[in-house]
A protein has these predicted regions:
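N-terminal beta-alpha lobe that positions the nucleotide/phosphoryl donor
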Residues: 1-186, 194-195
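Short, intrinsically disordered, charge-balanced linker/junction segments flanking boundaries
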Residues: 196-201
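Extended, highly charged clamp/arch subdomains and adjacent linkers
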Residues: 191
Length: 201
C-alpha cells in the first residue's frame, strides 16, 4: 500500500470529475484525499465511509500565475512581517478565469465551505508540514457576489500562509529553498446537517 501511494497520481481523479482548476500540481493533501477515496471505493466500502460530495482543487499553476501577475515574490522575500504579506495577498487579484470557476463552485455548494492548503511539500513523507499552513472556513450564506468575495479572500489567505513564520522557519531548518514550495488549494463543503439557521458539522 505504501509504494502504491508513493506512485499514485491523484490528478486524474479530480480532472475526470470536473473538479480541477488549472493544469499544475495538486499537492500532497489533495493526493491523499484522492487516494483514500479511490481505495475505499475499490474495497467496496463507499457506503460505510463518507466523504464530501465534491472536492475541488486549484492547482499550483494558479498559485504561480497569482504570484507573477501581482509581483508578490519581492514582497515575501523582502519582509518578515507576515501581516504585510497577508495584506498584499488580500489586495492582489486572482485571474478572471479563476474567479469565474470559483463562482461556479459556489453554485454547486450550499453548505459551509472549507478552504484548505495542499502544498507540494505536504506530499513529502520525510517532512511534517501538518499544521504549518492555513485552513479557512466560511458560512457560505448571502448573495453570490458576497460569497465569492469570501471565497476569494480565503484562497488568498491560504496562499499567503505559504510564507507564514512557522512554515518559513521549518523550511529553513530543513534547508528547503523558497522556490521549492508551491501551494494548491482544496475547496470542500463541510460535512454536516442544517437545523433551522444553524449548521452542525
Amino acid at each position: 500500500m505504501f509504494s502504491r501511494y508513493v506512485n499514485y497520481d491523484g490528478k486524474p481523479f479530480y480532472a475526470e470529475r470536473g473538479w480541477l482548476i488549472g493544469d499544475g500540481q495538486i499537492g500532497g493533501k489533495a493526493k491523499g484525499i484522492a487516494f483514500a477515496q479511490s481505495a475505499v471505493a475499490e474495497a467496496g466500502l463507499s457506503e460505510e465511509v463518507s466523504f464530501p460530495h465534491t472536492t475541488f482543487v486549484i492547482t499550483t499553476e494558479v498559485f504561480d500565475e497569482f504570484m507573477r501577475r501581482n509581483a508578490l515574490e519581492p514582497i515575501v522575500r523582502g519582509t518578515e512581517d507576515f501581516s504585510q504579506i497577508e495584506k498584499a495577498f488580500e489586495e492582489a487579484l486572482l485571474p478572471e478565469s479563476v474567479r469565474s470557476a470559483l463562482a461556479g463552485i459556489l453554485q454547486r455548494i450550499d453548505s459551509p465551505v472549507a478552504v484548505r492548503s495542499s502544498s507540494i511539500l505536504e506530499d513529502d513523507i520525510a517532512l511534517a508540514f501538518a499544521g504549518k499552513y492555513e485552513t479557512r472556513f466560511f458560512g457560505n450564506r448571502g448573495n453570490l457576489e458576497y460569497r465569492l468575495r469570501r471565497l476569494e479572500r480565503a484562497v488568498k489567505l491560504v496562499y499567503a500562509s505559504t510564507f507564514n513564520p512557522t512554515a518559513k522557519a521549518y523550511r529553513r531548518k530543513h534547508g528547503i529553498k523558497l522556490a521549492s514550495e508551491k501551494m494548491a488549494v482544496i475547496i470542500q463543503p463541510v460535512v454536516g446537517r442544517r437545523r433551522g439557521n444553524l449548521y452542525y458539522p
